[in-house]
């Protein structure tokens, strides 16, 4: 079961409960990518790094969307 974590203007991602995996996708559903294992861990670390940036960069959705677009 996937839980939505982030929904941006172009890209979003969901977390798969119980596995630690992520599903990245474009909001038009034309592209998606399933992250598991080390890839999921690296993605999670990148999102945590973005979330911990100081203002004015903290909570900047563009940085999160850029991180997702790298995988797609």
How would you name each of these model-derived features?
Residues 1-23, 27-31:
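Short N-terminal "domain-start" leader segments
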Residues 37-72:
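Mixed-charge, Lys/Arg-enriched low-complexity segments
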């Amino acid at each position: 079961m996937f839980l939505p974590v982030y929904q941006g203007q172009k890209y979003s991602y969901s977390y798969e409960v119980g596995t630690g995996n992520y599903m990245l996708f474009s909001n038009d559903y034309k592209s998606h990518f399933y992250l598991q294992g080390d890839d999921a861990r690296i993605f999670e670390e990148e999102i945590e790094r973005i979330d911990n940036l100081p203002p004015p960069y903290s909570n900047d959705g563009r940085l999160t969307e850029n991180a997702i677009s790298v995988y797609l």
